[in-house]
Amino acid sequence: LLPIIRTQASRCMDCGIPFCHQGCPLGNIIPEWNDLVWRDDWDAAIERLHATNNFPEFTGRLCPAPCEAACVLAINSDAVTIKQVELQTIDHAWERGWVVPQPPATKTGKKVAVVGSGPAGLAAAQQLTRVGHDVTVFERADRIGGLLRYGIPEFKMEKFRLDRRLAQMEAEGTVFRPDTNVGTDVTVEQLTTEFDAVVLAGGATAARDLPAPGREFTGIHQAMEYLPWRSEERRVGKECELKC
């Protein structure tokens, strides 16, 4: 697979104006790590990818890839498969043991609270921890991960990929406090008193509805009414018997 990915990376033209870079919400430096992958320098490629993206194994599986829609090559040919290059770069790095904890060399003595443990909260927490702040992540659910934990089905992204990132963050010094609802279990006054800064990274809990004909019918549900239940993998027992 890696030779195929390198061939795809070689198709990148390193455009004078890289519209893929503009199309990426994270501002990933796509032409640079495409070039490194093509040159078979995977170690440098993952460093360049991690420079703008804390969790490429998440985005490489879940992102709709607006970078590919913006690819200049797509004007008269197939776009570079940027998403697959990203995904193989990070998966290869995990396989080779290159993704390791990066604890700060020095501490600032500052304390930061991050409210919400979705992708935004986790990325903020990791960056803040790595520059030396003492970071605590508050999550009202019983497990850390937010939408990554409760909204993404297993067939889209296995939960072990989230768990190993959380283990990396804990090794770096980030503290997680699940099952803690800010506003009830912990007051805003407590946060502002105990911490030097607070990052609000809570997700949207109210879905946008559609005024479509038949919306009021029984059996039509919002996705987030079902996905958290399914993601918890609720089953009746561990074994079943099939009788015909």
State the predicted function of each range.
Residues L1-P3, E233-C240, C244:
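Conserved small/polar residues in nucleotide/adenosyl-binding loops
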Residues Q8, L87-K238:
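Residues forming the flavin
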Residues I29, H50, N54, E68, ...:
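A broad detector of the eukaryotic-type serine/threonine protein kinase catalytic domain
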Residues L1-K111, K159, V198-P228:
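Ferredoxin-type iron-sulfur electron-transfer modules and their immediate structural context
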